[in-house]
Amino acid sequence: MEETYLDLPIFHALFDSIKNDPEPQRSVSMKGLGTALLAGYFPIINGWIITQSRIQAAGSVVLRVQHYLRMGRDGQRPARIADHLLACVVHDTQDWSNAMEELDGLSAERWNVENGYCWVVVFHGLDVYFFCYRQNRPFGERYAGCGTRFFENGEEFIQNKYHLQRDTALIHEIMAFMASRTYILYAKNSFNTEP
């Protein structure tokens, strides 16, 4: 069986802190959990850069996973750094949808996304939500949930909320997929909504 983040002792320590420690240590551990998970799937050795955004939403922390877009034949100088994934770490006592609304208002002007699309991950305590951000959509329609497709009473649904301890294999699969593909490839080759 393939190893996941749950096999690493640091994640057990972070989970324990989030469940049992008083504030402000819980907040620090929530931010650390989001950052550590991203660093595991987007390592610097593969050309990824994880930075904290200057733009913050509703008291949460916004992280940007970026990569260089090369320009010219020499391939030496990056034209710009594109946002491949945006992550929002929201304290479990806060409403994460408020942070999403604020991000939606800021995103069209501020994010440097490639081809108008990128991944979005929201960490809310021990829950994680996965989205695709579509820059050219109207306000309120820029984020589409992505995850596991299922059917109920003949209707199709997308499950995009997962628990970091119980849904380890699914989260691992989604994070690995996000690390290896841009959103535009995902939209063309999967069950999710059109780009």
Regions found by a protein language model. Name each.
Residues 1-119, 127-130, 134-195:
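A short, conserved, highly charged catalytic patch centered on acidic carboxylates
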Residues 124:
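Charged, structured surface patches that assemble and position nucleic-acid processing machinery
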